[in-house]
Amino acid sequence: MKRREFGALAAGALAMGLPFRAFADETCQSPYMPKITGQEEFVYVWTLGVEGMGDEQDKLVTIDLRPGSATRGQVINSVSVGGRNEAHHGGFSADRRFFWTGGLDTNRIFIFDVHSDPSNPKLHKTIDTFVKDSGGVVGPHTFFALPGSMMITGLSNDDDHGGRTALVEYNDDGEYVATYWMPTADDMQGAVAVGDAVADGYGYDIRALIRKNVMLTSSFTGWSNYMMDFGQMLQDAEAMKRFGNTIVQWDLHTRQPKKVFNVPGAPLEIRFPWGSNANYAFSTTALTSQLWLIYEDDAGEWQAKAVADIGNPADIPLPVDISIAADDQTLWINSFMDGKTRLFDISDPHKPFQIYEKVIDRQVNMVSQSWDGKRVYFSSSLLANWDKKGKDDAQYLKAYNWDGKELVEDFAVDFYELGLGRAHIMRFGSSALYSS
């Protein structure tokens, strides 16, 4: 099946309300792609190179997850890309054959072939023209698969390196399609500011609810902040003003912004549930440590409200990655500063509450769970200049088993001990995806 044919098939199945879960994986992927519902076989870790360590380069690291394998829990392959680019996030194409990753500093995009040999990905293509293509967007962050194309969120721009940014779309062949700038107070592009919201033009994550034609984007900070030393930034009053405070609702099909919501404190990851009647999404705010609900009200209008605190906001635990369970009943929330993961009961999305917590290590960032929720994986790095220093700079991938009551460690991979670097985003692979 050709890639464009796959995209059309996926879109058609979803439009008819059919489940497109031939296989399935981590529950926070684009709904357009197949999922790994069974046992994930590999985890790909996009890793930041460290000066003086190993080859010093950013790399895609593959860890074996196959039950019974002699190398289970071990690194079995690594692909270096040349230099340090501030490796950060990545996402699969809609056919799941290619894994797109980005560098927040150099603005390079690396596309890996993960289908030819899922145990041994290969660098397929590098895009060096992101800033030029997009008309000045900097910091390719989230890679969200659409049928036949990849939507990429920017974090910054090449004018003032602040937070003003855009969405950038490429086709599956890596050819530039279009740029969609975030609305600002000076240029709302037809969007409406809800309540006291002020459109700041910032970007970070992107997710979509296809059957409602709704796309949401969140907001973080620009290059001048995310490349600054974390301690230095905290002492810089002007820098601390340069964080996003908005979530934007878009028309998925026309790519036009519709509403701007006031969500103070840098809302980061966005996650929609999977239920056919679940018309809402969650996000967390990094600086104010709150869980937010973006939801459709009884009148069919989308709204946003804070629904829970995460830890003690006064301690600034710094919520980072989140992962929603496939049954829409629970939500894992990691917080970087205290190294904790917390599990929230979200069975009533308007009244979530914490039911469990565990310290993973001295710092923790990303979380991914299997489709059945029985296996949960954690990785460590936030940003090269924001990670902790000295003995607190733990860099790892850790795998846990979850029985509904307790996380029990299965195995851990020390990325510093192996000379790999800083472990960031994780994505699962399986040869079963490509067997037919």
UniProtKB/Swiss-Prot annotation:
Keywords: Oxidoreductase, Periplasm, Plasmid, Signal
Induction of the gene: Induced by methanethiol, dimethylsulfoniopropionate (DMSP) and methylmercaptopropionic acid (MMPA).
Signal peptide: 1-24
Domain of life: Bacteria
Job description of the protein: Catalyzes the oxidation of methanethiol.
Family stated for the protein in its record: Belongs to the selenium-binding protein family.
Protein name per the record: Methanethiol oxidase
Gene designation: mtoX
